[in-house]
Amino acid sequence: MIHRSDGFIAVIDGATSKSAIRWSGERSGWAAARCLDAALGTLPADCSAREAVDRLSAAIRDVYRREDRLADLEVHPHRRLTASLVICSRQRRELWFIGDCQALLNGELICYPKEVDHIVTGARALFLELQLLQGSSVDALRENDRGREYILPLLKQQALLQNHPGGGPLWFPVIDGFAVPDEGIRIRPLPPGEVMLVLASDGYPVLKDSLAASEAALRALLQEDPLLFRKFRATKGMAPGYISFDDRSYIKFKLQSQD
C-alpha cells in the first residue's frame, strides 16, 4: 500500500497472514496496512522517527484492545497485525525503515533484509530440490507448494523474534503493536538539494529506477524460476493463475531542495 500526505510518503507492506484470524473480515496483512495508512495521516509533519513508530505501534495496539485480543497476541505473535514500512519524512528529509521494505536514493539501493529469511528460504529450497529428485515436478509443486507447508511452522515461530533483540542476529523489527527497539528504526538522512527516490515493498526482488523496468525484471525472474527457490529464494512461489508471488507497491518521486 502507498501512503501520500503533506508530511510523508510511504510504502506499507502488510505481512502475509499465518493464521485464520480475520479483522473485520480482512486478512491480517491488509488490515495492518489500512490501519497504518490511516495513522500516518494523523502524524505531525515534524515528528521524529521514534515518535512516528510509537504512534503507529499504538494505532495497531488500539485495534487489539477494541477486538479484545491483546492478551492472546502477547503470547501468539504470529497472529498479530504486522507490517514493514519505508517512510519519507518531507520536513526532516529522512528515510525511515522499519522492516524489509526498500528504497532507491539517487539510484543507490537501500534495504535491510532479514537474516532469518536466508535460513528459512534456504530450508524451503532444500526441501523442493529433494522433492524434485524424488520425482515431483515444478508444475506439481506450484499447484501444491509443499515447500511452503514445510517451513510454515518456522514462519509462525519466527514471529517470536519480532522486535526481540534477545534473539541475537536473527531478530528483526516490524510494526506489530508492540515496542520497536531503537536499533530497529533505521534512519537515512537525505542529501541537500534535489533527490530522486523510489520506495517499494520487497515484492520486487530486483528494484529498478522505473516501474516498467522493475516489472520486467520480475517477469523475467518468474519465467526462469516460478517456484522461487533457485535464482531467487522466497518463502513461497508463484501459484498457477497468479501474476507474481507477493504483493507489490512502488512509488517514484522527486524531492525538491525546499521540500
Model-derived regions, located:
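PP2C/PPM-type serine/threonine phosphatase catalytic domain
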Residues: 1-259
